[in-house]
Amino acid sequence: MKALLYSLLVAATLTSCSKADEAVNIQSLNQEFIGAWNSKDSGKINGFLADDVSFVQGSAHWKGKGEVSQKWVNETLPTIGNLKTSVVSSSTDANTAYEAGTFAVDVLPEAPGEPRGYGEGNYIFLWKKSDDKTWKLSYAQLEDLPVQRR
């Protein structure tokens, strides 16, 4: 029941923000995106990606929904858990929104018996309103520190 109420609240928030002259609630949008990562819902994550999304992390730069979906979402999703963000800066207008801050994540072992790790770093997510008035992730950049053993 709680999940249904939360879903209805999110849907109402996103629907009310779809008017041409209103900005989105970026914190709610990013929490829904992070929630999809934590529930390992690749379909929902990929649904947030713009067709021309760019992803940057260190020397990796991937462009387009297909490449970002395969190389970031599908390859990373099974290796992490408990993703948390701490917002440092955010802003919105009628057509764009961004959030930047720090993240922390559990890095899951690659094989049974190996230790878990802990990762942290900085992030920025840039969202743009699409032609159909839904918000899509247009740019994601992660800069992380070396993974620490737990």
Where is each model-derived feature located?
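Hydrophobic/aromatic beta-strand elements that line small-molecule binding cavities or substrate pockets
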Residues: 33, 68-73, 85-90, 103-104, ...
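Surface-exposed, charged secondary-structure patches
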Residues: 73-114
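Hydrophobic pocket/interface hotspot
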Residues: 33, 44-45, 53, 64, ...
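A short gly/proline-enriched turn/hairpin at secondary-structure junctions
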Residues: 52-63, 75-78
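Short, low-complexity N-terminal intrinsically disordered segments enriched in polar/charged residues
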Residues: 4, 16-51, 149-150
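Short beta-strand edge/turn micro-motifs at domain boundaries
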Residues: 120-148
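Sec-dependent signal peptide recognition
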Residues: 1-8
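Hydrophobic h-region of N-terminal signal peptides that target proteins for export
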Residues: 9-16
